[in-house]
Amino acid sequence: FLEYLDKDRVRVQLPGLSQELLQKTPGFSGADLANLLNEAAILAGRR
């Protein structure tokens, strides 16, 4: 899980981000989490 939150992928370090994501995404695989973070980046880029 944490490999998707490394410094290269998530530029902003938010306290508790990994714990909050773990609580809100039970049963997600690594691929699911990667897709979630990619979609979030795309949406942020559009704004």
Swiss-Prot record:
In the N-terminal section; belongs to the AAA ATPase family. In the C-terminal section; belongs to the peptidase M41 family. It comes from the Eukaryota. Keywords: ATP-binding, Cell cycle, Cell division, Chloroplast, Hydrolase, Membrane, Metal-binding, Metalloprotease, Nucleotide-binding, Plastid, Protease, Zinc. Transmembrane segments: none annotated. Seems to act as an ATP-dependent zinc metallopeptidase. Binds 1 zinc ion per subunit. Its EC number is 3.4.24.-. It is found in: Plastid, Chloroplast membrane. Its cofactor is Zn(2+). One of its GO terms (cellular component) is chloroplast membrane. This is ATP-dependent zinc metalloprotease FTSH, chloroplastic. It is a multi-pass membrane protein. One of its GO terms (biological process) is cell division.
